[in-house]
């Protein structure tokens, strides 16, 4: 939540440095905290090495734009948990593994318990184990089988209530961590994507975080309004373009049954697109060894922050960053996690040398319907989605039906994500009329500017639905 890089001090002591503007940065302040009058200082930098990796199309607002939180943890604390619910092939039974990492300041004998309840709070599973010492932490995994489970999907996003209980050496309850989990299975069979045994159809949208009055500092009410709008208009999927969103958003998608393409904070289109031409001689990260750890760290941040969210069906490696060994390494990272999700990345399309090692999909942006058909009619290798289509700038959206027809014609075509959900424009007082008006790039003496190019939403910046939404509601509704 700091754009674009930061140094941190506490009481004059240097604590650390962080990049990656859209995932949490955590620091241990314990050695430097005083009982009173602590001074936490953040030095924010507009330009840093992160600038090469954060070239998204949006307004530049440098500074702190998400919550800053101070946490105190108990002596026995759950540092990390990974819930892995599995839906078996019979679509009736399942299993859950719960992997835990615990810090224990004084106690060496810690017991971890796992409790699973249904929506009505009936206890379905209760199991515990003694954690083992591993690399200055206590670790352990609990595995359970379930004869019957309710499925999670867009039509019925059924979530179970999971709890991890930690007990100290003396038997006292040290910590309880609740989490809601769901059972669903996404897989590719004969080049077709299935969710819970049924062909997956994506009626999706790309969504930037935006508020016309506060920019990227959005609140819970903004998120609730967006979820409500999507459900009302038959939108079943969202791509977090082109960075991880605020953490509450993923919980809301879990609850609402919105399928999520969770995108890593990476875009470097300026390094390989020059005046519209594809010219990758200066591409970052490409195959440059010095950039590999930086992009892998961003992939890790994305995965570790959101790995427990049922709504995430796809990990996306980033946006418009061409292809090379470093992007391939990101694909390997996600694939090795074996978490049952699929991996997405569009820009491998520009470099076919990597088409077999990057992305589980053939994925394009703004391909014409006939271009989609050309691929699907000529020995296609992968299922096809449009990660961006129907660029809704001005009075657009008239051609949506031409794309939707392809869903019925080709099993390997799974739909796509409209560009995009909300206009990025800023509400200001008109100096002449005194009325609230929306302003775009170039309206703030910012030169050069891309003018209204950030206004491509199916809702205006104040979240009022555009006329184009009628087209979305109708055509997307055909595939509910």
Please annotate each region the language model reported:
Residues 4-11, 16-19, 50, 75-84, ...:
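Active-site-adjacent substrate/metal-binding segments within catalytic domains
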Residues 23-27, 136-142:
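Short strand-edge motifs at loop-to-beta-strand transitions and within beta-strands
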Residues 33-37, 146-159:
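Short glycine/proline/serine/threonine-rich loop/turn segments at secondary-structure transition edges
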Residues 41-107, 180-185, 299-302, 451-480:
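Non-catalytic, glycine-rich low-complexity segments
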Residues 269, 317-319, 337-352, 415-420:
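Aromatic-lined carbohydrate-recognition surfaces of secreted/lumenal glycan-active proteins
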């Amino acid at each position: 939540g700091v754009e674009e890089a930061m140094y941190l001090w506490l009481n004059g002591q240097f604590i650390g440095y962080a990049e990656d503007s859209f995932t949490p940065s955590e620091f241990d302040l314990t050695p430097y905290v005083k009982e009173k009058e602590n001074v936490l200082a953040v030095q924010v930098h507009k330009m840093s090495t992160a600038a090469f990796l954060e070239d998204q199309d949006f307004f530049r607002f440098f500074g702190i734009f998400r919550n800053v939180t101070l946490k105190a943890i108990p002596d026995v604390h759950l540092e990390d948990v990974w819930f892995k619910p599995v839906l078996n092939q019979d679509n009736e039974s399942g299993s859950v593994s719960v992997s835990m990492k615990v810090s224990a300041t004084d106690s060496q004998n810690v017991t971890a318990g796992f409790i699973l309840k249904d929506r009505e709070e009936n206890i379905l599973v209760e199991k515990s184990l003694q954690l083992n010492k591993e690399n200055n932490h206590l670790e352990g995994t609990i595995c359970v089988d379930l004869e019957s489970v309710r499925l999670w999907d867009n039509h019925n996003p059924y979530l179970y209530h999971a709890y991890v209980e930690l007990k100290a050496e003396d038997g006292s309850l040290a910590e309880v961590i609740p989490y809601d989990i769901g059972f669903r299975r996404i897989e590719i069979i004969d080049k077709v994507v299935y969710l819970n045994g049924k062909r997956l159809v994506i009626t999706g949208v790309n969504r930037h975080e935006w508020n016309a009055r506060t920019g990227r500092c959005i609140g819970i009410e903004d998120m609730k309004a967006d979820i409500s709008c999507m459900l009302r208009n038959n939108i079943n999927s969202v791509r977090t373009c082109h960075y991880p969103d605020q953490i509450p958003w993923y919980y809301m998608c879990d609850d609402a049954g919105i399928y999520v393409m969770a995108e890593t904070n990476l875009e470097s289109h300026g390094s390989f697109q020059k005046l519209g031409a594809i010219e990758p001689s200066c591409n970052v990260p490409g195959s440059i060894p010095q950039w590999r750890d930086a992009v892998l760290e961003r992939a890790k941040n994305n995965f570790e922050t959101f790995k427990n969210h049922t709504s995430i069906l796809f990990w996306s490696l980033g946006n418009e960053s061409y292809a090379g060994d470093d992007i391939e390494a990101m694909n390997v990272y996600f694939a090795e996690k074996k978490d049952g999700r699929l991996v997405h990345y569009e820009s491998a399309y520009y470099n076919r040398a990597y088409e077999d090692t990057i992305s589980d999909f053939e994925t394009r942006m703004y391909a014409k319907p006939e271009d989609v058909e050309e691929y699907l009619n000529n020995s296609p290798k992968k299922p096809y989605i449009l990660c961006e289509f129907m660029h809704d700038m001005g009075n657009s959206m008239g051609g949506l039906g031409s794309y939707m027809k392809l869903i019925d014609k080709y099993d390997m075509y799974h739909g796509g994500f409209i560009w995009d959900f909300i206009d990025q424009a800023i509400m200001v007082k008109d100096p002449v009329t005194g009325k609230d008006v929306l302003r775009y790039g170039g309206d703030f003496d910012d030169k050069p500017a891309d003018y209204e190019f950030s206004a491509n939403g199916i809702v205006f910046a104040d979240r009022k639905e555009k006329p184009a939404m009628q087209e979305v509601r109708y055509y997307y509704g055909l595939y509910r």
